[in-house]
Amino acid sequence: MTSVVVVGTQWGDEGKGKITDFLSANAEVIARYQGGDNAGHTIVIDGTKYKLHLIPSGIFFPEKISVIGNGVVVNPKSLVKEINYLHDSGVTTDNLRISDRAHVILPYHIKLDQLQEESKGENKIGTTNKGIGPAYMDKAARVGIRIADLLDKEIFAERLRTNLAEKNRLFEKMYESTPIEFDEIFEEYYAYGQEIKKYVTDTSVILNDALDQGKRVLFEGAQGVMLDIDQGTYPFVTSSNPVAGGVTIGSGVGPSKIDKVVGVCKAYTSRVGDGPFPTELHDEIGDRIREIGKEYGTTTGRPRRVGWFDSVVMRHSRRVSGITNLSLNSIDVLSGLGTLKICVAYDLDGERIDHYPASLEQLKRCKPIYEEMPGWSEDITGVRSLDELPEAARNYVRRISELVGVRISTFSVGPGREQTNILESVWSAK
């Protein structure tokens, strides 16, 4: 048995989809365990770019099982659209499995998400307005509708009527907005349920059986550790647990069955939406990194905020997610910069701190303490081993590993599969 979890170690958009796709070549089952279609990952295969939001990256391997676990919140409309997109691209989805325990995102969740965000004014969180938060709220309040409910016409109708009555009171009384009618949702979403019915099953059984049979299972996280509702920059976070511990809850697999945790990061830092970002760049260097790195959100299209590599963030991610291996992406984006900076600690009111504060007020006062390193001018997109990197690039990679305290198992010098270089196989024995 070998199981590997892939987690983002920053604020999402670290290149998890690419690394998951790369590691999927040696996996037999690939599973997502949290999040929804607010997550976006881009995969490049033979020069063709594919953008997915819900379906695991492993779908491109027809002989492998791709699982949407119970911890994922599923928008049936988005899922059907994504399935059709794959079919139109010549990709089969016969290997897809969807948990019958996963919760469903419905139009009232999306509307509530938008209204809540608008009402916050300057205190907005920066939500993608996909209904993710309200769906998880309903789940916690025990009024959510699950995939199993969606497939049963009578149960779906009953629970939808009950939920709409409550949500419409909220829309009309609190937000002075128009209600959503039952007929606007019911037939359309029941039909979506019937379209995905053939994929629905108890995915916990599939995953545990695979592990018990000694198969290789890969768990794919969405977003990143710094967006985790418990360990991230609360309240500027997502509504689920991207940390590796989220696997046990969101997939129905016990913690004793997790072998390795691969933390994915960029050679710099990026963030979409609001919230603290100590190493953020507001100058021409930041603009250059954004343009060369194509730092625009897969889901929203919004320009991402960019900054220098932050080892304080990375050490926090290592601790709370139990990271055993590091996958370092986008090193090539830094080519051509004369001097590079790595944040090694923060200055908080004159005191050096090495940990990431929970207090947003303290974070606002934190100033990054930088270590400068020489850059490199060479084009490294064709590099296929660590030894081929310029000396300055090698030193930069090694310094990141030292500061984070985790060995690097892969590094990437571009978006293609062939541009991902293995230093150590995570599929080897413990």
Curated annotation (Swiss-Prot):
The active site is at residues 13, 41. Binds 1 Mg(2+) ion per subunit. One of its GO terms (cellular component) is cytoplasm. Keywords: Cytoplasm, GTP-binding, Ligase, Magnesium, Metal-binding, Nucleotide-binding, Purine biosynthesis. Mg(2+) binds at residues 13, 40. Pathway: Purine metabolism; AMP biosynthesis via de novo pathway; AMP from IMP: step 1/2. GO terms for molecular function: adenylosuccinate synthase activity; GTP binding; magnesium ion binding. Substrate binds at residues 298-304. One of its GO terms (biological process) is 'de novo' AMP biosynthetic process. Its cofactor is Mg(2+). It holds the Pfam family Adenylsucc_synt. GTP binds at residues 12-18, 40-42, 304, 330-332, 412-414. InterPro entries: Adenylosuccin_syn_GTP-bd (IPR018220), Adenylosuccin_syn_Lys_AS (IPR033128), Adenylosuccinate_synth_dom1 (IPR042109), Adenylosuccinate_synth_dom2 (IPR042110), Adenylosuccinate_synth_dom3 (IPR042111), Adenylosuccinate_synthetase (IPR001114), P-loop_NTPase (IPR027417). Signal peptide: none annotated. Gene3D superfamilies: Adenylosuccinate Synthetase, subunit A, domain 1, Adenylosuccinate Synthetase, subunit A, domain 2, Adenylosuccinate Synthetase, subunit A, domain 3. The keyword Kinase does not apply. It is found in: Cytoplasm. Plays an important role in the de novo pathway of purine nucleotide biosynthesis. Catalyzes the first committed step in the biosynthesis of AMP from IMP. Belongs to the adenylosuccinate synthetase family. This is Adenylosuccinate synthetase. The lineage of its organism: Bacteria, Bacillati, Bacillota, Bacilli, Lactobacillales.
